[in-house]
Amino acid sequence: MNKKTILVMTAAMLSLASCSIIRGYRADGKSGPDIYSFEHHVHDTIDNGTLPFCFPFAKQQASWIDTLHFFNQGKHYKNTTLQEALTGKTDTQGVLIIQNDSIIYEKYWGDFSADRMATVFSVSKSITSLLCGIAVDEGCIKNVDDVVTDYLPELKKRDPMWQRLTIRHLLDMQSGLDFDDTYSLRLKHFKRLNAMAKLNYGHNLMRQIRGLKFRCEPGKEYRYESMTSEILGVIIERATGRRYADYLSEKVWKPLQMESPAIINIDSRKHDVAHAFGGISCTMLDLAKIGRLYLNRGVWNGKHIVSEEWIRQSTDYATDNDGYHFNWYNLSSIGADKPQYPGFYAHGIRGQVLYVNPYKNLIMVRIGKQDNTYAFIPYLFEQLSNNSNF
């Protein structure tokens, strides 16, 4: 091993240690954080109310789902049953299916249960989008075409591109920022891994944001970057004058009558910046209520929570921008043909999924420890929801 290689590796280890990635990878798994990462993180509590809404169980449970065969476009699952797929290679912990406001399928594996919290990772981005829509409705954020520096004026001195970057660019992953999402431990990916590690485990996220560079002009292309949702979360806090957890509690968790409190990771007690990009942990049943809100076009039991227009812009089927709008997906993101009854979904690493199909009045939630085929779970849910039994 030559001297240059030793110096590079030493610098890498020191940098990783400085942002606690070694602690993170030991605690959360050797290839990134796991669904119980909140147990090792500083976090804020998202309080719920005192009158919870509970989904009733349907008289007729959909037991036929376990034996239904489906065909996946990927190489891992050519022809298999749902039960085989979920218990085989994906390490699923729980699946919940709700139709017409009633639970028709609920199953848990291992020590997971209905009242156990799990980190939903990038599903948090979709919840951050919901909060942004509420802030727009309330006039705290004037318009999604406002530039970022209207809310983070300290960035004006950093790079002229900041004054071209809009909230819409953040919502649609068109920021132009030089940031890559990766959990690869290969040395050639060190620079990108280090940036992602700082986002997950660093103690001063605003310092990381101030140090960002641009690789292209905002709005030029779609490129998935967790940092964009983190910046959006900071904007929401600045615009509302509220901590993320408090605003989410008041505007979503309490009005939606969540059964349990949730939590969101923060960078540190000193700086108290929420992990808006992927730090929310909650129960499956409460996550399903976000789906119910979107299914009902922003209305919860007769009360308007967010505008129908915001829901429309987030979820209407479109093939541009890789099927991604306002932090929600449709299956055109993987090149799948549009089904007769298309849904939309929020997606987190390791296959955390909140899927909604408005045509079938369906909500599906999956929590798991891995998903070896990208978008396999959403694809499975799309196939399932288009089955004639629904």
Task: Give residue spans per PLM region.
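Bacterial Sec-dependent N-terminal signal peptides
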Residues: 1-27
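Active-site-proximal alpha-helical segments within enzyme catalytic domains
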Residues: 228-235, 276-299, 352-368
